[in-house]
Amino acid sequence: MRRAFSRRSALALLVTGFGGLCLDAAGAGAAPVTLLNVSYDPTRELYEALNKAFTARWLAQSGQQVEIRQSHGGSGKQARAIIDGLQADVATLGLAYDVSALYKQGKLIPENWVTRLPYNSAPYTSTIVFLVRRGNPKNIRDWGDLIRPGVAVITPNPKSSGGARWNYLAAWAWALRQPGGNDATAKAFVEKLYRNVPVLDSGARGATITFVDRGIGDVLLAWENEALLAKKQLGPDKLDIVMPSLSILAEPPVTVVDKVVERRGTRQIAEAYLKFLYTKEGQQIIAQNFYRPRDPEIAAQYAGQFPAVKLVTIDDTFGGWDRAQATHFDDGGSFDQIYGQ
C-alpha cells in the first residue's frame, strides 16, 4: 500500500506542477521553438495526438508556439541514431535498455535518468498479444500453438526492434513456466518458434504491414496497442486478438536528452512535454490510443479495453535489461545461436 500511495502522490504532484512550469517557461511573444521526439516504431498515432494537445496547452498558457517533430523506427536503431548524432530533444523508446544506452554509450543523459519521472519514467505500459485472421482459422490460443507445423508467425527482428525483444522474452518466459521448464527447454521452444517465422522486419510497424497489408502469416506477435489499432483501422470483421495465458509487462520509458536540450535551450519545454504525458489529459490520450495508462482513475475508465492477463516482468524473470540483452540479444547471444548470424 505504501508503494502505491507514493506513486500516486508523485503523479499528483507532477500533474499539479505542470501548469506552473508552462507559465514560467516563456512569455507572450516568445520565439517559436521546435522539438524532435525520437520514438519507437508504433507510436506515430499516439504522439500525433499528444503533440496536438500539448502544443495547444503550451500556447494557451505561455503564448509560445511549439512544433514537435517525430522520428520513428525500431527502438534499438533509434537509440543508435541518437548516439550517432540525431538531435533528439526527447527520446521515447521501447525499452529501458535502449534509453540507458544514451547514457552508457553516448553520455547524453545522466545515469539516474530512470528516477526523474514517475513509474521509472514510463508513463504508459503495454504487453504482447497475438493478432490473428478473423475467426482464428489456425485455432491459435497460446504460445505452444506457435510451434505447430504450418503456422506462420510474424515478429520483427530483436536486433533492431524493441517490440521484438519483448516478443522473444515473453515466449521464453512462457516456456520456462511449463512443466520441467528451464533455460534449455525455453531455448528449444523459441528455436522452434523462429523456424515458423518467414520474414523478420526491422520494426513493429513493418511487421504489422507484413501481416495486415501484405497478408503474410497466420499470427502476428504484437504490442497490444498495435493490435488494437490494426483491428480498429481494418474493422472487427478482419482480425481477432488472442490474449495468451501469460505475457510480459512492457514499460516503454521516456527521457529528455540532456546534452541536446542544453545546447538548444529547449530543456523547459522538453521537460514540460514529458510531464504532460502524466496529466489527466495526457493519460486519456494514451488510453484512447490503446496504451495502458498509469493513472488509476483513467485505467479504471478503460478497464474494458484492457483485459486482465498474467504478466511477468523483465526484472523478476530475466534479471533486468542489462542481463537480458547480454544473454539473448548481444552478438553471440541466444538469438544468434537460434537464428544464425
Predicted regions and their residues:
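N-terminal secretory signal peptides and thylakoid transit peptides that target proteins
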Residues: 1-17, 24
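A bilobed periplasmic-binding-protein/Venus flytrap-type ligand-binding module shared by bacterial periplasmic
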Residues: 127-136, 251-268, 285-289
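Extracellular/periplasmic juxtamembrane helices and adjacent flexible linkers that interface
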Residues: 261-341
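Ligand-binding pocket segment of bilobal, Venus flytrap-like solute-binding proteins
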Residues: 178-245
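N-terminal segment of the mature folded domain
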Residues: 31-160, 339
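Short helix-loop capping/hinge motifs at secondary-structure junctions, enriched
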Residues: 135-141, 160, 173-181, 260-268
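Short beta-strand->loop
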Residues: 38-40, 113-122, 132-134, 144, 152-179, 194-197, 231-248, ...
